[in-house]
Amino acid sequence: INDIFETEVTENTINLHFTISDPEKYGITDYPVTLGDLSNDAMSDSNARLENYLSGLSSFSYTELTLNQQLTYDILENYFQLQLDMADMYLYDELLRPSTGVQAQLPILYEEYSFNSKKDVEDYLKLLALTDEYFDQIISFEKEKADAGLFMSDFACQNIIDQCNAFIVDSDNHYLIETFNTRIDKLTGLTQSEKDHYRLQNEKMLREHIFPAYENLAAALTDLLGSGTNENGLCYFPEGKQYYEYLLAYNTGASESVKTLENMISNERVKVLQESSDLTTENPELWELASEATLTPTDSATT
């Protein structure tokens, strides 16, 4: 389990950074700085690794495990098998989405990347330098989707193009310069000379890698405009319904069918509404009390 954790968490340095504040405490001292690998070779390696994980799990005697261990076993087995089952539908994945796609989320992650040590700063700068290559892989992936008739709609594509163009406006005063400088100023243990050096390096990485990455992505997507064959959403692709069911299982951990889950939600909603109606019928003043109630952030977090 520890080996699986280390392998998976170090596949993407951003995930590692936001998951573990001090990797050394977990024995993770030597890891490659990477944004991940989207190549077909990497995908094949990932599938082989999943098969090895499942093989490793099968070596355990399930009945001899504790209840907690059985729960861990079940979760891992389901997670690994689910990914393998849908591996052939990888082109249904969408890396570029208006609010949650890579192009939208990566700048936020860079902005919020905390600097707790000199190594954090150096890892961050290395990630910036890798961004254009990573975006090139995204472009290749989107072209492959287009060739397969699975490219996004023109509306979604134009939205992302506009985002990319907006991101590089006023690059001399970009927020990734300002936020970097603020974090560097707060980091103790660096000399003024080191801080000045890192500031210059950050601006250089933005000019040479980040801004060109977004320019190239916008240009590539512009070339792909008109490649989309479906304006109606995921379920309208040939195997879109099946992929949606996979996403539901992957994101919720539920093994029930879509129809069963819909019924469960509907029944629970009816139950809650009925309970609310009964309470307010017996105590009409609850309506007024509810409208007057206010919650502090602490209250809402614990409610």
Residue ranges and their predicted role:
Residues 1-303:
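N-terminal maturation segment of proteins
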